[in-house]
Amino acid sequence: MRTPSDRLDRRTVLQGLGAVGLGWAGAAQALDQPRGPVVLTLSGQLRKPNDGRNAHFDMAMLERLPQTSFSTRTPWYAQARKFTGPLLREVLAAAGAHGSLLRAVALNDYWVELPIDDAARHDVVVARLLDDKPMAVRDKGPLFMVYPFDAQPELRNPVYYSRSAWQLRTIEVR
């Protein structure tokens, strides 16, 4: 004869299934390990790092994220140019970034701080292509964080120009 302590009640079963389901969802969304050279590192407040407390991305990982393209004029080019890459918010989400401030650091150690809200409010792209071609370091590559200046005219000012970062190598999440 079974006693109440021998059988599982419905709530226990549902809680267990929920925990297993959450475990599967978390595993399915885990950030892959880079297989090629690391082109971007996220550090700081991350929920899904792939190397200790950092999230490293190679170019293939960035290519697998949803891609966005836009053409815009910038202070750095004489004509409008086409930028293609994942949205900054997609990159941050892939690493489980949470915080209020981002510090973008370039290969030459130039850095700029921007509110993390910019990633939600504006379609900021971590561009890996310029006019459909990979960017060399001498052409502001391999990654260029750029705002859609022409799509949102309020962005055409020194504050947002200064928040763009070419030769991007690191994003610190604070």
Name these PLM-found stretches.
Residues 16-22, 68, 94:
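Residues within well-ordered alpha-helical secondary structure of globular protein domains
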